[in-house]
Amino acid sequence: LLVTSDLQRARQTAAPLAALWTRTPTLAPGFREQGFGLLEGLDVPTIQARHPELWRQWLTHHADFALPGGESLRQFHTRVMDAVVELVAAHAGRRVVVVTHGGVLDMLWRSVRGLSLDGLRECDIPNTGVNRLRWAHGRLHITSWADASHLADLPAQPPTNIARA
């Protein structure tokens, strides 16, 4: 089973795998990136120029802070974990590939590790990295994380300008 966030960038990332497997991905809005509300789609320099106070507040990484029209980390975490539980219930015992976003992966990492939702990200999340998790005894377990070995033969990519870790 191939599941992807319904956002365009995740669908595009899933497309080669879907073609290889000759499967149509199941779209799952629960695996969308965090909702950034008013700041959705804006780049960092634009946010800093137009909304400096919101930018400052967002960088505090408080679990209950939500941008206007967006989700707090706590709301986001709840949505992601609800999506995981729903997926497990619907496909128990099956191997499922989920194409999703860095923020979603951060929520999974924090949940498995028992980490606070406050504070900076504490795990590597390379673009198109492979993370293997399994559901056992009523919870998620990480079996491998941030595997990018499938990218080893590609040319180095320039770093991205992402202000939030």
Question: What does each of the following model-derived ranges do?
Answer:
Residues 7, 48, 73, 77-81:
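Amphipathic, non-transmembrane alpha-helical scaffold segments
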Residues 4-5, 78, 99-100:
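Short beta-strand scaffold positions
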Residues 54-75:
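Short glycine/proline- and acidic residue-enriched helix-loop micro-motifs
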Residues 77, 81-89, 109:
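Generic structural signal for well-ordered alpha-helical scaffold segments
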Residues 23, 34-46, 89-94, 110-165:
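Acidic, low-complexity terminal tails and accessory targeting/binding regions
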Residues 87, 94-103:
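Generic beta-sheet signal
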Residues 1-56:
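Phosphate-coordination/substrate-recognition cap region in phosphate-metabolizing enzymes
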